[in-house]
UniProtKB/Swiss-Prot annotation:
GO terms for molecular function: metal ion binding; ubiquinol-cytochrome-c reductase activity. One of its GO terms (cellular component) is respiratory chain complex III. It comes from Zeus faber. Belongs to the cytochrome b family. This is Cytochrome b. Binds 2 heme b groups non-covalently. It is found in: Mitochondrion inner membrane. It is a multi-pass membrane protein.
Length: 380
């Protein structure tokens, strides 16, 4: 008789996705980040739920409610540190996951990839509205600067900004709705993750060789379930270490000052994981142009499958494009650094060069190199 996990309508879905799933035998540690992102999402939802039990979304009490969580709630300080640093780990895993997809040509599963880009945008939106909630100086001014960008939209810009603010400035209505959005989005992300999963399981996983692996599959459990478990332990250990020993390392000291609309912080900047996009935004001396560049810096990922020119899938056997991939990684690192620097010489020009290179790599240099490699191999 077949076991219950293979016959029960609900358990059968779990079985086909996590137990008897045929997975390529040669997938490396770079394939761990999908499950790590799932763990991050679960951690964020759980810690966020406990924080929401004690938080008040009112400008008079928001800042002190966060202080109350850290001082008076049992292990509130730990929950808050896990939640704040969990966001950083979420983005670390996200960038590594996207980097893996770019390196090994996983983007050729177009539906999975595009749902992934939408997920990326949703996570960014969630992190942005979440950063506003403690109602510190950087929360307030970050919200003011970023929401103000919508005023660059022709004709309806100003109306749009006031509609999002719920008034004529970032105020109580803004904080309340941002809290509502921050609570809602993770559940939308969870639903989209299931969709991401669904599309992935239509095709099966890619692998480091970029070849069809139907002839060489192993079951997900126990092989990759234990491999993922090791990743969980490593990530939770790193997150715990950061949260317990240096919880404010990645935060901004200005956010320990309650929001004051009359005093602007000397340098308004977002959290580290948005700095590369912020640098691209700032490198264009035009409001609408900057906003379009900011959007394009993320949405360009959707063009990657269309711009794939090589006859090979991944970069495993393509040394020229490999170099360009690492140039892209270095370029994003430079943009991240520039995003945290003041707008002055030489940072302005470095940011502009790095921004041009970022788009050039995706749109021109990598597709051309892929085509050249085909020519060199006489695969035209």
């Amino acid at each position: 008789m077949a076991s219950l996990r293979k016959t029960h309508p609900l358990l059968k879905i779990v079985n086909d996705a996590l137990i008897d799933l045929p997975a390529p035998a040669n997938i490396s540690v770079w394939w761990n980040f999908g499950s790590l992102l799932g763990l991050c999402l679960l951690t964020q939802i759980l810690t966020g739920l406990f924080l929401a039990m004690h938080y008040t979304s009112d400008i008079a009490t928001a800042f002190s409610s966060v202080a109350h969580i850290c001082r008076d709630v049992n292990y509130g300080w730990l929950i808050r540190n896990f939640h704040a640093n969990g966001a950083s780990f979420f983005f670390i895993c996200l960038y590594l996951h996207i980097g893996r997809g770019l390196y090994y040509g996983s983007y050729l599963y177009k539906e999975t990839w595009n749902v992934g880009v939408v997920l990326f945008l949703l996570v960014m939106m969630t992190a942005f509205v979440g950063y506003v909630l403690p109602w510190g100086q950087m929360s307030f001014w970050g919200a003011t600067v970023i929401t103000n960008l919508l005023s660059a939209v022709p004709y309806v810009g100003d109306i749009l900004v006031q509609w999002i603010w719920g008034g004529f400035s970032v105020d109580n209505a803004t904080l309340t709705r941002f809290f509502a959005f921050h609570f809602l989005f993770p559940f939308i992300i969870a639903a989209m993750t299931i969709l991401h999963f669904l599309f992935l399981h239509e095709t099966g996983s890619n692998n480091p060789a970029g070849l069809n692996s139907d002839a060489d599959k192993v079951s997900f459990h126990p092989y990759f379930s234990y491999k993922d478990l090791l990743g969980f332990v490593v990530m939770l250990l790193a997150l715990s270490t950061l949260s317990l020993f240096s919880p404010n390392l990645l935060g901004d000291p200005d956010n320990f000052i309650p929001a004051n609309p009359l005093v602007t912080p000397p340098h308004i900047k977002p959290e580290w994981y948005f700095l590369f996009a912020y640098a691209i935004l700032r490198s264009i001396p035009n409001k609408l142009g900057g906003v379009l560049a900011l959007l394009s810096s993320i949405l360009i990922l959707m063009l990657v499958p269309i711009l794939h020119t090589s006859k090979q899938r991944g970069l495993t056997f393509r040394p020229l494009t490999q170099i360009l991939f690492w140039v892209l990684v270095a370029d994003v690192a430079i943009l991240t650094w520039i995003g945290g620097m003041p707008v002055e010489h030489p940072f302005i020009i470095v940011g502009q060069v790095a921004s041009v290179l970022y788009f050039a790599l995706f749109l021109v240099i990598m597709p051309t190199t892929g085509w050249m490699e085909n020519k060199a191999l006489k695969w035209n």
